[in-house]
């Protein structure tokens, strides 16, 4: 038998990309139903038949007033909720009704975002080699990744990865995974989709479960998609951000700070009051670990994409590292206009940042700055840290 003509090392080298993973396109989508935060307390207590809980309603109004959210989008309409009272009652068995919604709507909303990203990318969808789909709800087999593959008409041989119930840090997770896939598979083009529908967490108020009420004041529905690939073809692909490094860590002494449990009543969340404090206390170390190799220690010299879990988290992070208010502008804009969409938020923020940078005449997609950070915060407490590098804005770029 003749000996092998190539070595394993040569094969591996040929499989790997030359350059870093790059975001090549971004698309976002929301349900049509828009709810304004100023009107939401009256609506929420009316539809859940809880108007007799007057003190709790006043407390909820204060939560909404302090949320820094102007509006949110929700698939659940008043008409639908009126027909599904089990979803409006506090802790009523309702998982079947919720599941019936999300297994259909999660891939549908994800498809809308993916179509926009693929259109901006401008290449045949047959060039998509990998699909990473992330959602907090709607576990089924085959899953939303399969449904989206069918709905978009992707190749049957597309390599799929389905991520369920990761929570609010997962916008960073999907980029970390996409980076590894793109850089270790030469020519790969990874479609990443985060699609979040609050139907699994919506429920009526309870005086004994105020952390659930916090979620009702913050969460919204949305989907975002990005196309990621290394070694972009400059003739037909327009890079937006380079993914330089990515890391995940569990914060010390944070067990139980954020957790969720899927039960007959849907997905229940528990939050400790000290979540903003735990994140801000540890943000310096995360920044140092990520940027020390680059010789960067001025946190106002980089652009920021931070999961907007709530205004207190953003306020305390800003204070801890001495950030100028301008650094969180894109993050606060997404919180204001969409609420907390879990994993999709940071991708919405990337989209807002590159568009606003172009509109404002900035030199780069990162608000005129070269280096940036993307943070995901969620159950664990888990923190995802992604180091980004912007690209120069050319005429017509970054505004699609």
From Swiss-Prot:
Enzyme's top EC category: transferase
This protein's pathway: Secondary metabolite biosynthesis; flavonoid biosynthesis
Family: Belongs to the thiolase-like superfamily. Chalcone/stilbene synthases family.
Gene Ontology terms, MF aspect: acyltransferase activity, transferring groups other than amino-acyl groups; naringenin-chalcone synthase activity
Function noted in UniProt: The primary product of this enzyme is 4,2',4',6'-tetrahydroxychalcone (also termed naringenin-chalcone or chalcone) which can under specific conditions spontaneously isomerize into naringenin.
Catalyzed chemical reaction(s): (E)-4-coumaroyl-CoA + 3 malonyl-CoA + 3 H(+) = 2',4,4',6'-tetrahydroxychalcone + 3 CO2 + 4 CoA
Active site per database record: 168
Keyword Nucleotide-binding: no
Stored Pfam families: Chal_sti_synt_C, Chal_sti_synt_N
UniProt-listed SUPFAM superfamilies: Thiolase-like
E.C. number(s) listed in UniProt: 2.3.1.74
Coiled coil, from the record: none
Protein name per the record: Chalcone synthase C2
PANTHER family, A to Z: CHALCONE SYNTHASE (PTHR11877:SF14), HYDROXYMETHYLGLUTARYL-COA SYNTHASE (PTHR11877)
Single GO BP term: flavonoid biosynthetic process
Alphabetical UniProt keywords: Acyltransferase, Flavonoid biosynthesis, Transferase
Organism, scientific name: Zea mays
Membrane spanning stretches: none
PROSITE patterns with a match to the protein in the record: CHALCONE_SYNTH (PS00441)
């Amino acid at each position: 038998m003749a000996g092998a003509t190539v070595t394993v090392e040569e094969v591996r080298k040929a499989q790997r990309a030359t350059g870093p993973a790059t975001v090549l396109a971004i698309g976002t989508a929301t349900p049509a139903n828009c709810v304004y935060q100023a009107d939401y307390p009256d609506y929420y207590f009316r539809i859940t038949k809880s108007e007799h809980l007057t003190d709790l309603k006043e407390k909820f109004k204060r939560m909404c007033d302090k949320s820094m959210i102007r509006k949110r989008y929700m698939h659940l309409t008043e008409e639908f909720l009126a027909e599904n009272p089990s979803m409006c009652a506090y802790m009523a068995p309702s998982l079947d009704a919720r599941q019936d919604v999300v297994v259909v709507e999660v891939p549908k909303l994800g498809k809308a975002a993916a179509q926009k990203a693929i259109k901006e990318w401008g290449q045949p969808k047959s060039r998509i080699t990998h699909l990473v789909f992330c959602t907090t709800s709607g576990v089924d087999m085959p899953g939303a990744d399969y449904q989206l593959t069918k709905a978009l008409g992707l190749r049957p041989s597309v390599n799929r990865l389905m991520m369920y119930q990761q929570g609010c840090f997962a916008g960073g997770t999907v980029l970390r995974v996409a980076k590894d896939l793109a850089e270790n598979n030469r020519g790969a083009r990874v479609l990443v989709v985060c699609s979040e529908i609050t139907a699994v967490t919506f429920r009526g108020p309870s005086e004994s479960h105020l952390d659930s009420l916090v979620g009702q004041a913050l969460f919204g529905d949305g989907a975002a998609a990005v196309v990621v690939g290394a070694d972009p073809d400059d003739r037909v692909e327009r890079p937006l951000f380079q993914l330089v490094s990515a890391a995940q860590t569990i914060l010390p002494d944070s067990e139980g700070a954020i957790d969720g449990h899927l039960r007959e009543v849907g997905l229940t969340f528990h939050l400790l009051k000290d979540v903003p404090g735990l994140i801000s206390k540890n943000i310096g170390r995360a920044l140092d670990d990520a940027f020390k190799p680059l010789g960067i220690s001025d946190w106002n010299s980089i652009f920021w994409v931070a999961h907007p879990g709530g205004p207190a988290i953003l306020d305390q992070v800003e204070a801890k590292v001495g950030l100028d208010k301008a650094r969180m502008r894109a993050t606060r804009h997404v919180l204001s206009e969409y609420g907390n969409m879990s994993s999709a938020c940071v991708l919405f923020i990337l989209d807002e940042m590159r568009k606003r940078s172009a509109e404002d005449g900035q030199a780069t997609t990162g608000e005129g700055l070269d280096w940036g950070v993307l943070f995901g915060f969620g159950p664990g407490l888990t923190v995802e840290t992604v180091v980004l590098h912007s690209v120069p804005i050319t005429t017509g770029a970054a505004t699609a």
